[in-house]
Amino acid sequence: MNQPLAYVHPGAKIAKNVVIEPFTTIHNNVTIGDGTWIGSNVTIMEGARIGKNCNIFPGAVISAIPQDLKFQDEETTVEIGDNVTIREYVTVNRGTVDRGKTVIGDNCLIMAYCHIAHDCIVGNNCIFSNNSTLAGHCTVGDFVILAGM
């Protein structure tokens, strides 16, 4: 269900049974899988690939350009697996030309205020506690619980 107060670019591919709450912005070249819920005031920028049955809470920003001075607007992505929960005010930056993508695997919980920088690879079944951050180019295996400030 697309709320009339949300903006969804005509070039975005939204599957069935996706709920998009008011004041959310979804840019061009975005794919969102079936059964995903997107809360209010979420921004999903170009290059986002979001799997099935995900929950993205208010204030999250997905697929913003990387915070890397070498970035020259290359076409890169953020790939989020199935059954991922992204809590309030999480930021996930898309990749650079190095890896070309930032990846979050299936069944992950990314708690409030986390930051996952460009070119990171997060495995399946991971939990990031509140305020955890990854600098660019980090790799996190499966079943990792990450905490830190």
Residue ranges and their predicted role:
Residues 2-148:
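Structural signal for interior beta-strand "rungs" in well-ordered beta-sheet cores
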